[in-house]
Amino acid sequence: MDLLIVLTYVALAWAVFKIFRIPVNQWTLATAALGGVFLVSGLILLMNYNHPYTFTAQKAVIAIPITPQVTGIVTEVTDKNNQLIQKGEVLFKLDPVRYQARVDRLQADLMTATHNIKTLRAQLTEAQANTTQVSAERDRLFKNYQRYLKGSQAAVNPFSERDIDDARQNFLAQDALVKGSVAEQAQIQSQLDSMVNGEQSQIVSLRAQLTEAKYNLEQTVIRAPSNGYVTQVLIRPGTYAAALPLRPVMVFIPEQKRQIVAQFRQNSLLRLKPGDDAEVVFNALPGQVFHGKLTSILPVVPGGSYQAQGVLQSLTVVPGTDGVLGTIELDPNDDIDALPDGIYAQVAVYSDHFSHVSVMRKVLLRMTSWMHYLYLDH
């Protein structure tokens, strides 16, 4: 484009010299040359500032690392590598034996606990009846002891000291039986009264454990979180998969919008507004230009973020060298859909300022696209 402008200016200058018969000497030639330098430089500077361009752009994709929620040996892996997978389809399975065994054991424990509750209720009824019986016997023995005691206070005592002592001991022994029966009844009642939301606490605990065990059993089948595809599937049956967030075993690429992430000079920030028109060219599609819209400007420069590390930190980058990130959403296009995710691109954004100069940027971008046909491999 620069050469085209220069040639156009040379042609116009030649025409002016011929039409107006301007004498050709060192002064007129110098004036024409300097005029061309200022004109071309001014146009290029206006274009660069008002219609930003960057060659640092990429068809961005968000990947989901797949990590199992439970640990086990892989028994089955999907064969849909690099193919569209619907949400909920199986990605891989883990050996479920020990998780199924825990579910079975907890179900048995829950059934036993439920039966034990019925047994406790029966024992409580029996303890209440026993308490009533031994209490009645205690009352009878107490009256008998009182009778012996009153008789011993009469002028003529009809009872011997041994009879009185036996009556007293019988009463005390029966009273101890009553206290033991009441304690047993209270213990059973305490076990039955340990309630959570109207249900016996042991039953609630076992139900919660069973729910967790069933969840873990379900997690032995790892499914697609959404529509998308998996690539570079390296796990095989027999692989040990651990529930560690730092050790994903598969990468899932969900379906998402055609989005380009571009890094612009910080000088261009005032001319980058969401909603501006944008054009994108790809190295893989020479000669083609794709239209889109600038949708957002990231509110932070990546190199300016810091994390607490317990030590003093300096700047991570030289200020001004790290670019501003913007996202461009492309119009629907089958050629773009066929491109691999992550492929590189070049982007131009057209602002409302000096819109007539945008023609230069558009021509330059198309020339860049055609230049992608030219490369050498050695």
UniProtKB/Swiss-Prot annotation:
Taxonomic superkingdom: Bacteria
Keyword presence, Transcription: no
Keywords: Cell inner membrane, Cell membrane, Membrane, Transmembrane, Transmembrane helix
InterPro entries membership: CusB-like_dom_1, CusB_D23, MFP
Compartment(s) where it occurs, according to its Swiss-Prot or TrEMBL record: Cell inner membrane
Membrane topology reported for the UniProt record: Multi-pass membrane protein
Regions crossing the membrane: 4-24, 27-47, 55-75, 233-253, 281-301, 310-330
Family: Belongs to the membrane fusion protein (MFP) (TC 8.A.1) family.
The protein's name in its UniProt record: Inner membrane protein YibH
Gene name as annotated: yibH
